[in-house]
Swiss-Prot record:
Gene Ontology CC terms: ribonucleoprotein complex; ribosome
One annotated GO molecular function: structural constituent of ribosome
Residue spans of biased composition, Basic residues class: 46-66
Quaternary assembly: Part of the 50S ribosomal subunit.
Protein name according to UniProt: Large ribosomal subunit protein uL4
Pfam families for this protein: Ribosomal_L4 (PF00573)
Keyword Nuclease carried by entry: no
Family indicated by similarity: Belongs to the universal ribosomal protein uL4 family.
Entry-linked InterPro entries: Ribosomal_uL4 (IPR002136), Ribosomal_uL4-like (IPR013005), Ribosomal_uL4_dom_sf (IPR023574)
Keywords: Ribonucleoprotein, Ribosomal protein, RNA-binding, rRNA-binding
PANTHER family for this protein: 50S RIBOSOMAL PROTEIN L4, LARGE RIBOSOMAL SUBUNIT PROTEIN UL4M
């Protein structure tokens, strides 16, 4: 698949890039993408939820009233799960939600996600650009020139550029990342992917 390279004004530069078929032209595996995205979202969970059992609730050591003769049901503690203010039965405890996915599956998932975007025509390539200062306006104008200002965009750069990253972080629809750090979730969670030209080489080195 070939794509025309655009400039920051949204016009064609006359240059054409060829997408690597091993990355952008594979058969899409929805199951691999599902496994990878599920693990990514699960691994983000802190797992610090905690409810106290009857043994952990403060107090309740003394028997609230005598065993017999009151007419009430027998109770040994005011911290019983049956009492108001008591412990919780089978409540949430701290745990790890981490899920392991094999490297080959993660690789297939990212290739599948990129291939799905390529087949849908949701990949654009722009020439490499730099900004002189941290300003949101130039980045917003680039998106407007490309007709992407109303879409959820993933911009991939060849390397971390602090000025570009900070200039774009105030735009809600824009997510800027380096090509070698992108995940399946990042790809699928965007309406379109905007590659800087040399970022294509970077991602081919990573996923090739």
């Amino acid at each position: 698949m070939e794509l025309k390279v655009l400039n920051t004004s949204g016009t064609e530069t006359g240059e054409v890039v060829t997408l690597n078929e091993e990355i952008f032209g594979v058969e899409v595996s929805e199951h691999a993408m599902y496994l990878d995205v599920k693990s990514i979202l699960a691994n983000k969970r802190q797992g610090t939820h905690k409810a106290k059992t009857r043994a952990q609730v403060r107090g309740g050591g003394r028997k609230p009233y005598r065993q017999k003769g009151t007419g009430n049901a027998r109770q040994g503690s005011t911290r019983s799960p049956l009492m108001i203010g008591g412990g919780t039965i089978f409540g949430p405890q701290p745990r790890s939600y981490d899920q392991k996915v094999n490297k080959k599956v993660k690789l297939l998932a990212r290739r599948s996600a990129l291939s799905a975007k390529a087949k849908a025509g949701k990949i654009l390539v722009i020439e490499d650009f730099r900004l002189d200062a941290i300003k949101t306006k130039p980045v917003a104008e680039i998106l407007k020139n490309l007709g992407l200002e109303q879409k959820k965009i993933l911009m991939l750069t060849p390397e971390y550029d602090m000025i570009i990253a900070r200039s774009g972080r105030n735009i809600p629809v824009l997510n800027i990342m380096t090509a070698d750090k992108v995940s399946t979730y990042d790809i699928l969670n965007s309406s379109a992917i905007l590659f800087q030209k040399t970022a294509l080489t970077k991602i081919e080195d990573t996923l090739g």
